[in-house]
């Protein structure tokens, strides 16, 4: 997991060939004024989703993780909190991995929580199980999906 401010994104753009195109797009567009939906940057290799997510309490949050994609998440309208837990520490899955949706959900209670404000981002790699959308009200946010590259 990486947490940083948008101004520092150049430091990590070399970690994946699609990071640079995603961050260039984020920096040159007013995402908060865009309609909810998917924005293709490089087809299924890199795309954004603008979402209006209903905030939830920490005890209602559900851990998720992905195998094919890396998530870059950034709140646009207000602070958003996230739970995090290493994949190696997870307990029982709620259901088997959904190949089409690229997600697995877990029953573990959320314990470690951090909060981001607009202009800050988090990168969740496949080993980073996360519980997004912790907060109050409707949270406008951006979720970039970046195809994982095997080394």
Predicted features, each with a name:
Residues 2-50, 57-65:
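A short, N-terminal "cap"/entry segment at the start of jelly-roll beta-barrel domains
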Residues 43, 59-71, 89-93, 109-110:
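A short beta-loop-beta micro-motif enriched in histidine and acidic residues
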Residues 43-45, 65-69, 75-77, 98, ...:
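Short connector loops at helix/strand junctions that flank enzyme active sites
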Residues 114-129:
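Conserved metal-binding segment of the jelly-roll/cupin
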Residues 121-123, 137-151:
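A short hydrophobic beta-strand segment most commonly corresponding to one strand
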């Amino acid at each position: 997991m990486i947490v940083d401010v948008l101004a520092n994104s150049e430091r990590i753009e070399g970690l994946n060939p699609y990071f640079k195109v995603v961050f260039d797009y984020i920096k040159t567009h007013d995402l908060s004024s865009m309609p909810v939906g998917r924005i293709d940057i490089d087809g299924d290799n890199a795309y954004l989703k603008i979402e209006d997510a209903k905030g939830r309490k920490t005890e209602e949050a559900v851990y998720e993780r992905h195998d094919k994609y890396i998530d870059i998440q950034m709140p646009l309208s207000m602070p958003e909190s996230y739970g995090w837990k290493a994949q190696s520490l997870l307990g029982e899955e709620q259901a088997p991995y959904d190949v089409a949706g690229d997600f697995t959900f877990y029953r573990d209670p959320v314990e470690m929580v951090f909060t981001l404000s607009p202009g800050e981002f988090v990168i969740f790699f496949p080993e980073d199980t996360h519980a997004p959308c912790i907060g109050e009200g409707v949270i406008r946010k951006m979720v970039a999906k970046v195809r994982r590259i095997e080394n």
